[in-house]
Amino acid sequence: MGRIQRYINGLVATNKCNLDCNYCYLKLQNYGLEQRTCEHKYDIDYIKKAMSVERWGICYISLCGKGETLIDKWVVDLARALLEAGHYINIINNGTMTQNLKYMRESFSHEQAERTMLTFSFHYTEMKRRNILEEYLNNVKTMKESGFTVYIHITLADEYIPYLDEIKELCIEKAGIVPQLGIVRDESDRTKEEALTKESMERYFKLAEPFHSPYFELSRRLYEDPCVTKYCYAGELGVLLDFSTGYMKQCLCNNVGCNVFQHIDRPVPFSRVGWGCEAPWCYNPALQIFGLIPGQDYPYFSDIFAGERKGCTSEIMIDALDTKLADDYVKAHPEKQEE
């Protein structure tokens, strides 16, 4: 199928969650999840046509809900349709929707599973409180054994600090996976560059070292050197797209956009951020794993899954995702850079 040509940060309207985590960014933004319903403006067959490779190129589409992504079976059907359209998929989920994970295993072909990554967020203390740790770890292991690329992600919240060794050992013993870490963001004010921790940043970064997490190391680099003053191809080679409404924006913090599902006979009107980033720091490391700022030495996708994590991904995913989109674009279109 070839390498990806675009990264899509995809939103879906799964506006409910079965967990209640203290550091949840939606909770910090006072976004209530209890009574909300899951609503989708377009049906899946229409979305599949709207997301054709002819319009978008081959994409890596990361799906995430405002709540638990897989709480709605619709997301599994959407992911399969996007795979049928020729794309690669990631689904960020909390690993507890056992029936919908089973439905995914039963409805995806082997080839589709090989083009699907499952990012399992691990909410240790909340899962322990609800007595669902075993269910979570069993689901992760089962999906890995079924041919999916799997990834355990732990947001390094202060409440986990006393349990870090236990968490790491549990993931290795029960799921055969060394987890990755991410910085916990203070989302109560998205205009500021702040981590949600009472620790000094020096000690906070030190706590992550035993995990040898390339993802955390990239997050740290982006925190210390926000890179928002550099020329960025978000809005063109990477976008934020709400699959429930069809509305596309440049990225999480840059709001230029439009509905790209209204007139699917027309080209997608991409508009890159360029020098005009409005974010306090680039807190979505995936944008830089796929290289939306040219000329940087940030890690590749294969670096994230190197060493003891190598067995968690397929060669198909490595071949497709091991690229720097902006560097490739600049080489192919030298006349269009920094327009």
Regions found by a protein language model. Name each.
Residues C38-A50, V76-D77, L101-M104, R130-V140, ...:
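Well-ordered, non-membrane alpha-helical segments in soluble/globular domains
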